[in-house]
């Protein structure tokens, strides 16, 4: 999946908001699973959505490209929900 397939609305800003990051991840997972975005619960662990290690690495890589920030490809194991990953990203981007 290409990172640019999901619209980057913060191109003129320095950093995306928590909502923008969370929405990007939700949209990404929804597109990957071919479901509506409103079916994705941000508190459900990624593995419950059936994301295997290659899908997790793909998500991390596309998110890295979208944010234009270097990210650890294993971060989805440390932050196993959309909610926890979003919180982590907001904290790390503001450093």
What is each residue range found by the language model?
Residues 1-95:
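Flexible, low-complexity inter-domain linkers and amphipathic docking helices that mediate domain-domain
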């Amino acid at each position: 999946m290409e990172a640019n397939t999901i619209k980057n609305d913060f191109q003129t800003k320095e950093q995306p908001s928590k909502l923008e990051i969370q929405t990007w991840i939700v949209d990404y997972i929804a597109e990957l699973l071919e479901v509506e975005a409103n079916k994705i619960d941000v508190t459900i662990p990624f593995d419950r959505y059936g994301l295997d290690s290659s899908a997790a690495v793909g998500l991390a890589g596309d998110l890295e490209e979208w944010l234009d920030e270097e990210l650890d490809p294993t971060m989805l194991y440390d932050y196993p929900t959309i909610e926890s990953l979003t919180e982590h990203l907001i904290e790390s981007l503001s450093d």
